[in-house]
């Protein structure tokens, strides 16, 4: 009864109390959506938005030549089908990419000499090949040269204006010097900064500084670029001062009598210089030397006072806001920005000037910094200012007004050279309240003026103005893969543009076609370089599905245009309050990259501007709704946000009077009616890896970090088991990672075998349509991953089962039943055992080796290439000189090892011979050789052999041959096998379509009367007229004649139509498979000089061994120290031994108590399984089994429906369901919303108050002194395997200069004997061993040759010579101009000459190359 108890579904009991409101968004959507937006491949050309690739083309084209007589315009682009599919690219080492074709138009103009008007002379339009562009696979990766790569998203500073100060470090007084910076997406930076004298300076592109007013004046000399809000600004001193300062009007009433206009806004905080009286009542409102308070100002306004009397002293030192001119003579009496002195004031009074304006500067709230800057700056006109800027940017260039203005305009106001991007414009609009449209991406006059105003306000200490926090996520944005590629494409196109311009001017444009102008090489080169060697294009971490998902969700602050490890300080790396729900505070690497590489939180997504958003539920009047919206860090600032676990009743109303909330990064308590938003889920705070750790809330942060990082290093095991104690998101990770096979449509499973699943899909069609309703899923079998782990998919469905779209139908690596399964559930005991678990060592049971519990399969790929060398062609063959038959026993006639052969180090995988010849052969010799065959002495054995440390089984071999080269037997056999596989798929597909079509025909014909006789090809009657068609009669007629059965009405036409449609579908299927088979038969594209390439894959089974690293999910890692027989391990009262013994001292100091809680809950879950197993074995009645099962499934989502199902199950099906639980009841305890102690006790059942067990010593049978914590923990085997690290060398390659052995396993190097090791040997007095280490075993060339000979002859003498490193030292000293000479004693000379006589050559010269093997 496959329909009820389905195999591909796991039921988990969830302990979470908080209902799931929003689904977790697709985990790799950040990659896929970004790249889709970049390519816009599925959007018709005319509907594409100007972003991504389209945007780049639009911004670079049209390209005009230097004389503007012709232009090359962009029309549209489209992508063609990729040449190879994903699998073929993997196998052949190709890049998965599609050719891009661009339609361009070349327009040639005629120019009228007199009027300068242009008219079109000629238009040519053409489609041009524009290179290849890598495509993203289904899983968000790229395949470059056959390897999977991921482009990591970059976190960088958002464009816009930023304000900061130097934290008092620049000047000894500790004074804060404020600065501002306008950062564009691309273009020149503008920096404003104050010095310690409060003068404001500007720097352009970090060059020498100028007074800021020079830039402000220069703005007057260029037109405003604002589209919506242009301003009149001509850069005069008066305009600049009035923009930044308020003015006061001073009236001269007579000698020594002055008044100023009463301006309530400016009076606040000022002191009165005399008693101020109410004009009507004459009472004193403000006493002399007292401040104007708010109440006093209100009284003055109520009294309708228009002006205030002031003392002459108050007017002195005021600054004039405008030129004061004598109207009779036209003489300037007081210049703008001039200080008012006693003499000037008297002069004004004498000349009869009644009033003048001064700047309001009170040195408290308004400082004279900008006025002082204007005084410093000696420039008076915009033209001079622009020239001055030119001199600073191009020192040594004589400026002309035209070139200077051009440079200045191009710097900031030309969209080709300067781009704020939409984000930059959005930020400027937001900061300064400007309403400029987002498509205006250059700076405007107002932007620059407002930046200066804000900076001056900061300096003045204006309230509500503060410096920016650059680590706030509103000031950092994500550049995902699409945007990074867009920037690369732009670089390539700009390079190409230069070449096109040159070609347009060099050649006759009339005769050219667009393709003559365009060379796409620069673009392709840039893209290739980006994918091949950019810091952000990384080799995918493919250890297990979680590591893949995490790698695609990673955010890096490093990379081009980002930070560097050395420069990044503590603040950038630290967790910021805006990371909440956006960036995970836990998952980041340990080491130099800590905090610079982060991971997106589970629910986070990136919006169109590149800011990270997180979802919140809306709260209305204290009631939480189910409406969910996403907010970026800036948008959430004003809101009061409740935690996801705030208590609410069934209607969603907060139950308490006070709710714990967050506002602007601080924790506050608020009333329910003040709350605006609420978190969606408790695990929105952490990333995917961290949310897989149960009881994360009980772990110390450092250990949680290790735990989430180590899960990514877990090796996929041979027998996978999902965790008994999970967190409920295991299924989501497995599904989104793309390693499982997921059903594309609803349907019924037709057939299943280990390598493929055939599904007949439910396709709603009309009576006569024949649709392709077959989905064939070819599973991946034993494929090598980037990290040499094994990728293998196995079906989890049976024929006849119904599947829904999105169901998992096959498990991938490290998944079980569609859930992530990185490790194994094992019974652990926390106790010391004979010191074998000292310092985090792990003691484990031999059962793991016997039952392959922690066994993993690793696949190594070996490649053998036959090249065409100068001396002749290399050949892959079985006929190898000087190799016995025993070594060739597993090679086939082509010289390639057979599949299934067991190999060990030194075995031949592919036989290859290379011609060796001292001389090039003459034509005659070549001819004689061709006639009489090769001499064996002319070739040497260069076969591919198994390297040391690898032993396993050959599972696959692939042969690639050049086009036009005869394929060998092995290649033909492989090709035939592939072809047979394709034909099987084709036949299955046609069969299912045929069955479906004839099913429809049968339905139409049943019950109809035959209106005409039907005969077969030989004339035999099949049906006679008048027969009534039923099932039995129809089955006697072969199906190919059904279309010819004559019946009344329009049924016959319908039947014919079905037959026609079926034939059409059949041809389509054949065409598709024909293409695939054609590709198989074609030769392969190989690198130049390569004739044939063979790849051999060897599978290595690695059992758990002493020295392997293991870990739990809470950062509790250790190394296996001993494997104990089961009978020696501590065992429980019922005789079951534990699997692993861990040290209890590893818990308290590490503070990862989560592991203990997991152990208890795992024990409870396991016990449920054991009890059910016992009930089955003891044949309990179906009623008791039903009761037990229903109790087990309490608290599962939809448990009422489950209970009903259990009641309805027939008695014989109950044990089946119970056996599914025999390993234990799977539970989920979500992060920050997990199981409580009382719930765990309830699951454990009665009588286990202490949650500890009595254990017995396996060797003596006696109980241990104290009770021991025993339970089930999920343990992982990490990718640090001792078999891959162990390495030994006897003879191997030596370094060329020092003649010492190379280092490292990859180079087959030796062990380094360092300074401390020498001391240790000296301390033990092991003089001869030490002498041997430092000479004959290392770099004494003569000595080691002698040693070799002595060993061969069987003598045991040691004669050490002079180490080569001594010669290196002498050469080093000589290079420092020290004359060092090595003098030889007569005895030594005699010994050397004797040795030279024996060896037949001079000694002491370094012989051989870096990889010279010292073999005789």
From Swiss-Prot:
Its EC number is 2.7.7.6. Keywords: DNA-directed RNA polymerase, Nucleotidyltransferase, Transcription, Transferase. GO terms for cellular component: DNA-directed RNA polymerase complex. It catalyses: RNA(n) + a ribonucleoside 5'-triphosphate = RNA(n+1) + diphosphate. Residues 1388-1416 are annotated as: Disordered. The keyword Transferase applies. GO terms for molecular function: DNA binding; DNA-directed RNA polymerase activity; ribonucleoside binding. Pfam families: RNA_pol_Rpb2_1, RNA_pol_Rpb2_2, RNA_pol_Rpb2_3, RNA_pol_Rpb2_45, RNA_pol_Rpb2_6, RNA_pol_Rpb2_7. It is an enzyme of class 2 (transferase). Coiled coil: none annotated. NCBIfam families: PRK00405.1, rpoB. DNA-dependent RNA polymerase catalyzes the transcription of DNA into RNA using the four ribonucleoside triphosphates as substrates. Belongs to the RNA polymerase beta chain family. The RNAP catalytic core consists of 2 alpha, 1 beta, 1 beta' and 1 omega subunit. When a sigma factor is associated with the core the holoenzyme is formed, which can initiate transcription. This is DNA-directed RNA polymerase subunit beta. It comes from Anaeromyxobacter sp. (strain Fw109-5).
């Amino acid at each position: 009864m496959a329909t009820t108890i389905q195999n591909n579904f796991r039921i988990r009991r969830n302990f979470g109390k908080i209902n799931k409101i929003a689904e977790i968004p697709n985990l790799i959507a950040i990659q896929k959506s970004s790249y889709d937006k970049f390519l816009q491949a599925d959007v018709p050309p005319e509907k594409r938005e100007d972003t991504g690739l389209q945007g780049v083309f639009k911004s670079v084209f049209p390209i005009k030549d230097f004389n503007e007589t012709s232009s090359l315009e962009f029309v549209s682009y489209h992508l063609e089908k990729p040449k190879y599919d994903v699998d073929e690219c993997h196998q052949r080492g190709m890049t998965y990419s599609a050719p891009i074709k661009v339609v361009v138009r070349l327009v040639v103009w005629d120019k009228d000499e007199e009027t300068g008007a242009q008219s079109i002379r000629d238009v040519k339009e053409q489609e041009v090949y524009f290179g290849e562009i890598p495509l993203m696979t289904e899983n968000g990766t790229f395949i470059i040269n056959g390897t999977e790569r991921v482009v990591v998203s970059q976190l960088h500073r958002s464009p816009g204006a930023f304000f900061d100060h130097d934290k008092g470090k620049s000047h000894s007084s500790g004074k804060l010097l404020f600065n501002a910076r306008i950062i564009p997406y691309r273009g020149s930076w503008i920096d404003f900064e104050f010095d310690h004298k409060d003068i404001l300076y500007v720097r352009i592109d970090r060059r020498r500084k100028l007074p800021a007013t020079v830039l402000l004046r220069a703005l007057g000399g260029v037109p405003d670029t604002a589209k919506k809000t242009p301003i009149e600004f001509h850069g005069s001193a008066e305009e600049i001062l009035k923009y930044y300062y308020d003015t006061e009007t001073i009236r001269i009433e007579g000698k020594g009598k002055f008044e100023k206009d009463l301006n309530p806004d400016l009076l606040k905080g000022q002191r009165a210089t005399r008693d101020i009286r109410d004009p009507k009542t004459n009472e004193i409102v403000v006493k002399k030397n007292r401040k104007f308070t708010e109440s006093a100002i209100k009284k003055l306004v109520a009294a309708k006072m228009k002006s205030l009397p002031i003392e002459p002293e108050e007017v002195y030192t005021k600054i004039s806001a405008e030129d004061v001119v004598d109207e009779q003579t036209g003489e300037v009496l007081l210049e703008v920005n001039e200080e008012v002195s006693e003499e000037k004031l008297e002069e004004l009074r004498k000349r009869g000037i009644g009033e003048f304006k001064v700047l309001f500067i009170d040195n408290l709230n308004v400082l004279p910094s900008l006025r002082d800057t204007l005084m410093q700056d000696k420039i008076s006109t915009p033209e001079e200012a622009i020239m001055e800027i030119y001199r600073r940017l191009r020192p040594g260039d004589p400026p002309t007004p035209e070139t200077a203005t051009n440079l200045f305009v191009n710097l900031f106001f030309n969209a080709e050279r300067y781009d704020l991007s939409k984000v930059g414009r959005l930020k400027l609009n937001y900061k300064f309240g400007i309403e400029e449209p987002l498509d205006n991406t250059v700076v405007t006059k107002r932007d620059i003026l407002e930046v200066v105003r804000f900076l001056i306000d900061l300096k003045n200490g204006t309230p509500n103005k503060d410096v920016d926090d650059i680590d706030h996520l509103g000031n950092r944005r994500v550049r995902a893969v699409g945007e990074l590629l867009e920037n690369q494409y732009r670089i390539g196109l700009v390079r190409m543009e230069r070449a096109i311009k040159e070609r347009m001017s060099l050649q006759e444009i009339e005769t050219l076609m667009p393709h003559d102008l365009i060379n796409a090489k620069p673009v392709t080169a840039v893209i290739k370089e980006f994918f091949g060697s950019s810091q952000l294009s990384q080799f995918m971490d493919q250890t297990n599905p979680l590591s893949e998902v995490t790698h695609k969700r990673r955010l890096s602050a490093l990379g081009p245009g980002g930070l560097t490890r050395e420069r990044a300080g503590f603040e950038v790396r630290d967790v910021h309050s805006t990371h909440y729900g956006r960036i995970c505070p836990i998952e980041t690497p340990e080491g130099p990259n800590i905090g610079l590489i982060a991971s997106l939180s589970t629910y986070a997504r990136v919006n169109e501007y590149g800011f990270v958003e997180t979802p919140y539920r809306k709260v209305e009047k204290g009631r939480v709704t189910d409406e969910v919206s996403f907010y970026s860090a800036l948008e959430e600032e004003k809101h009061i946000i409740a935690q996801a676990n705030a208590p609410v009743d069934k209607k969603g109303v907060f139950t308490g009077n006070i709710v714990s909330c967050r506002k602007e990064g601080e924790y506050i308590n608020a009333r329910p009616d003040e709350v605006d938003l609420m978190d969606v889920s408790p695990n929105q705070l952490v990333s995917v890896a961290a949310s897989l750790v149960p009881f994360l809330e009980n772990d110390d942060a450092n250990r949680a970090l290790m735990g989430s990082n180590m899960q990514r290093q877990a090796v996929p095991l041979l027998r996978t088991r999902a965790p008994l104690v999970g967190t409920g998101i295991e299924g989501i990770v497995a599904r989104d990672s793309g390693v499982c096979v997921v059903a594309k449509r609803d349907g019924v499973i037709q057939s299943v075998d280990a390598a493929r699943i055939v599904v007949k899909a439910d396709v709603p069609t009309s009576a006569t349509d024949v649709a392709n309703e077959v989905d064939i899923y070819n599973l991946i079998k034993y494929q090598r991953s980037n990290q040499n782990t094994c990728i293998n998919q196995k079906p989890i469905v049976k024929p006849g089962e119904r599947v829904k779209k999105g169901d998992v139908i096959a498990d991938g690596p490290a998944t079980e039943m569609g859930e992530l399964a990185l490790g194994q559930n094992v019974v652990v005991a926390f106790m010391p055992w004979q010191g074998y678990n000292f310092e985090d060592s792990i003691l484990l049971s031999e059962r793991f080796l016997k039952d392959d519990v922690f066994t993993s399969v690793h696949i190594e790929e070996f490649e053998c290439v036959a090249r065409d060398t100068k001396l002749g062609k290399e050949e892959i063959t079985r006929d190898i000189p000087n190799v016995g038959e025993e070594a060739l026993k597993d090679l086939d006639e082509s010289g390639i090892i057979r599949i299934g052969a067991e190999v060990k180090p030194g075995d031949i995988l592919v036989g290859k011979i290379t011609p060796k010849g001292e001389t090039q052969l003459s034509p005659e010799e070549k001819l004689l050789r061709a006639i009489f065959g090769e001499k064996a002495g002319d070739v040497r054995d260069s076969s591919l052999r198994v390297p040391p440390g690898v032993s396993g089984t050959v599972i696959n071999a692939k042969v690639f041959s050049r086009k036009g080269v005869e394929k060998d037997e092995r290649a033909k056999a492989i090709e035939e096998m592939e072809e047979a596989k394709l034909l099987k798929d084709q036949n299955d597909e046609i069969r299912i379509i045929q069955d479906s079509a004839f099913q429809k025909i049968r339905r139409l014909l049943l019950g109809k009367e035959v209106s005409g006789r039907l005969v077969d090809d030989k004339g035999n009657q099949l049906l006679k007229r008048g027969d009534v068609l039923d099932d039995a009669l129809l089955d006697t007629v072969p199906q190919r004649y059904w279309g010819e059965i004559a019946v009344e009405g329009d049924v016959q036409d319908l039947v014919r139509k079905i037959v026609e449609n079926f034939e059409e579908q059949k041809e389509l299927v054949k065409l598709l498979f024909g293409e695939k088979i054609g590709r198989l038969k074609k030769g392969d594209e190989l690198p130049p000089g390569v004739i044939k390439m063979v790849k051999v894959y060897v599978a290595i089974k690695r059992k758990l061994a002493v020295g392997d690293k293991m870990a739990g999910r809470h950062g509790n890692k250790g190394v296996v120290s001993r494997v104990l027989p089961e009978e020696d391990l501590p065992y429980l009262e019922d005789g079951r031994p534990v699997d692993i013994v861990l040290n209890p001292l590893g818990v308290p100091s590490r503070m990862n108590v989560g592991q203990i809680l997991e152990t208890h809950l795992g024990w409870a879950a396991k016990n449920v399984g054991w009890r059910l197993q016992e009930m089955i074995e003891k044949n309990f009645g179906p009623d008791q089994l039903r009761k037990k099962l229903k109790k087990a499934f309490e608290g599962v989502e939809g448990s009422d429906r489950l209970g009903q199902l259990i009641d309805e199950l027939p008695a014989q099906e109950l044990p089946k369901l119970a056996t599914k639980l025999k390993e234990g009841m799977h539970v989920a305890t979500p992060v920050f919303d997990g199981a409580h102690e009382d719930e765990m006790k309830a699951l454990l059942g009665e009588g286990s108050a202490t949650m500890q067990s009595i254990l017995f010593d396996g060797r003596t049978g006696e109980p241990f002194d104290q009770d021991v914590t025993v339970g089930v923990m999920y343990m992982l085997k990490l990718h640090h395997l001792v078999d891959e690290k162990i390495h030994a060398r006897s003879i191997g390659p030596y370094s060329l200069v020092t003649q010492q052995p190379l280092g490292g396993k990859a180079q087959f190097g030796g062990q380094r004997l360092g300074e401390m090791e020498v001391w240790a040997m000296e301390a033990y007095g092991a003089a001869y061993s030490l002498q041997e280490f430092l000479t004959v075993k290392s770099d004494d060339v003569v000595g080691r040759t002698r040693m070799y000979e002595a060993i061969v002859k069987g003598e045991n003498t040691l004669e050490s010579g002079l180490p080569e490193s001594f010669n290196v030292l002498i050469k080093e000293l000589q290079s420092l101009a020290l004359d060092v000479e090595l003098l030889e004693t007569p005895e030594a000379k005699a010994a050397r000459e004797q040795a030279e006589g024996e060896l037949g050559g001079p000694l002491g010269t370094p012989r051989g190359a870096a990889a010279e093997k010292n073999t005789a």
